[in-house]
Design a protein with these regions (language model features):
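Conserved non-catalytic scaffold segment of RNase H-like nuclease domains
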Residues: 1-111, 123-145
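Active-site phosphate/pyrophosphate-handling residues
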Residues: 93, 116, 152
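Short, flexible loop segments at boundaries between secondary-structure elements
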Residues: 113-121
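Acidic, divalent-metal-coordinating active-site segment for phosphoryl/phosphodiester hydrolysis
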Residues: 146-159
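Beta-strand segments within the central parallel beta-sheet cores of soluble alpha/beta enzyme folds
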Residues: 111-113, 173-174
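Acidic two-metal-ion nuclease catalytic site recognized across multiple nuclease folds
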Residues: 157-181
């Protein structure tokens, strides 16, 4: 199980690019997974995007385009259950496009657990933005909109959901993944 989050130059995966990614969690033997890197998008980062995540053109200079990160990225996500907030609707679309741009096969994951979809399915009261849910569940998100902080928060949020609604999680992870589809 690995948490994934991205920061990008904008919202459209067809025209915008990744500027930071994080993969956090543990593998099947319980050892820690932690990979976080800035990425040179090969274009200028718009000021309105920098205003959200704080990542500047100077920050990413020399970080390598995403195609230079795919080996390490693939090694972690291949066959993994990927957890993230809006990971299906946003993050994985960017990952998919970056692999296509690089002429590479997109890694095959075991499945996704999207904490945004899960919050809606569980009918959690209030807004379902990651920051709002973290406030509700007392999850520290001081560095919101940085990939490592958001990926970690998504994993903790999943754990909080599992503790609050144990009856909804009394099945193998594959069953949980299927109910979110």
């Amino acid at each position: 199980v690995v948490g994934l989050d991205l920061e990008t130059t904008g919202f459209d995966s067809r025209s915008e690019r990744i500027v930071e990614y994080a993969l956090v969690g543990s593998d099947s033997d319980g050892s820690h997974i932690g990979l976080c890197s800035l990425v040179d998008p090969g274009r200028r980062i718009p000021p309105d995007s920098t205003a959200v995540h704080g990542i500047t053109n100077e920050d990413v200079r020399g970080s390598g385009e995403f195609s230079e990160h795919t080996d390490a990225f693939s090694k972690i996500v291949e066959g993994a259950i990927v957890v993230g907030h809006n990971v299906i609707g946003f993050d994985w679309g960017f990952v998919h496009m970056e692999y296509l741009r690089a002429g590479l096969e997109v890694p095959k994951v075991r499945g996704f657990i999207d904490t945004l979809k899960l919050a809606r399915k569980l009918r959690i009261p209030g807004r379902h933005r990651l920051g709002d849910l973290c406030d509700r569940y007392s999850i520290d998100l001081e560095r919101a909109h940085r990939a490592d902080a958001d990926a970690s928060a998504s994993l903790i949020l999943l754990w909080k959901f599992m503790n609050e609604y144990p009856e909804r999680f009394r099945k193998p992870l594959d069953g949980i993944i299927e109910t979110l589809d």
